[in-house]
């Protein structure tokens, strides 16, 4: 009887761009040999809106409402880096109270970012129940944002050159302390529910490994880098805002797999609560914005130095000119290094506004992580990277 010969050839399938686990409009062209992934090509650009060009045709004050749409899970970080770039270039100091308020907002947004990552990631790997718990906790953070800024998820429009738009409202500090007391036991609950679950551990342990050297060579940052054993956090490295005033640690893992990335983010939420508590306890008095910013920029002979204006809050002018020069400024967002390369030419509009999003670099490593893995691991590995396509495509 003749032997039947089975011929197999690679098959190319498209995952996305409209797929429930693609974390935005991302398309993956995956080459398969049976269940094994041979190659993967991410196709991006579906959410490109020309944010850099928009920035070059807006004043800094006008552009702040736009920026929370890059990474719409972490709008405060986008606002922070947007005002930090002109501040550093113009040499505008930020009052201590404003810096503390900024840190509180950034750390709340870091927790919200990690929660928004954790819920869908667990749903991707088959755990549906924690998804609803996590969104419950996120609501409390958005309530705090709403009380301070008037908006919840995005478009907070809260950060300003030289400070913040408004002081914290009456009772806000107490409400934030209550959230910290409420949230830490919930993180313990997540750990009991998820971290010690043998099915979850077997699903992620050893999957999507990346070594320390590879992580550095690929230009990874944030939890992706720290999960591979590199203790690199811009809050410690660049000493921006007032993070040096607080006692906190940089969570690190050495395994470099999906489970390590999960553990690093869980520990980061604990550290963020620690920072928020210290900032609330040490919140100084004084102005919440630099009232001298306008006088400093206009110079000694400005009318703003006159007697008539000495009792008026000298807020930053809407026609603030970005000084001539260039500067790269970065912050540690929930996903990694978020940077702005700014070139000013003594005009109200920037000459160049280059955005360096963290998840764009982190997404580049995906084809390497997927090679040799199973189809079922694609979603788990992609979810562990934490990408937001608004930030990747800009």
Curated annotation (Swiss-Prot):
Belongs to the complex I 49 kDa subunit family. It is a peripheral membrane protein. Signal peptide: none annotated. Coiled coil: none annotated. It catalyses: a plastoquinone + NADH + (n+1) H(+)(in) = a plastoquinol + NAD(+) + n H(+)(out); a plastoquinone + NADPH + (n+1) H(+)(in) = a plastoquinol + NADP(+) + n H(+)(out). InterPro entries: NADH_Q_OxRdtase_suD (IPR001135), NADH_UbQ_OxRdtase_49kDa_CS (IPR014029), NDH1_su_D/H (IPR022885), NiFe-Hase_large (IPR029014). The keyword Transport applies. NDH-1 can be composed of about 15 different subunits; different subcomplexes with different compositions have been identified which probably have different functions. One of its GO terms (biological process) is photosynthesis, light reaction. Keywords: Membrane, NAD, NADP, Plastoquinone, Quinone, Thylakoid, Translocase, Transport. One of its GO terms (molecular function) is oxidoreductase activity, acting on NAD(P)H, quinone or similar compound as acceptor. GO terms for cellular component: plasma membrane-derived thylakoid membrane. It comes from the Bacteria. It comes from Thermosynechococcus vestitus (strain NIES-2133 / IAM M-273 / BP-1). It is found in: Cellular thylakoid membrane. Its EC number is 7.1.1.-. NCBIfam families: NuoD, PRK06075.1, PRK07415.1. It holds the Pfam family Complex1_49kDa. The keyword Manganese does not apply. This is NAD(P)H-quinone oxidoreductase subunit H. NDH-1 shuttles electrons from an unknown electron donor, via FMN and iron-sulfur (Fe-S) centers, to quinones in the respiratory and/or the photosynthetic chain. The immediate electron acceptor for the enzyme in this species is believed to be plastoquinone. Couples the redox reaction to proton translocation, and thus conserves the redox energy in a proton gradient. Cyanobacterial NDH-1 also plays a role in inorganic carbon-concentration.
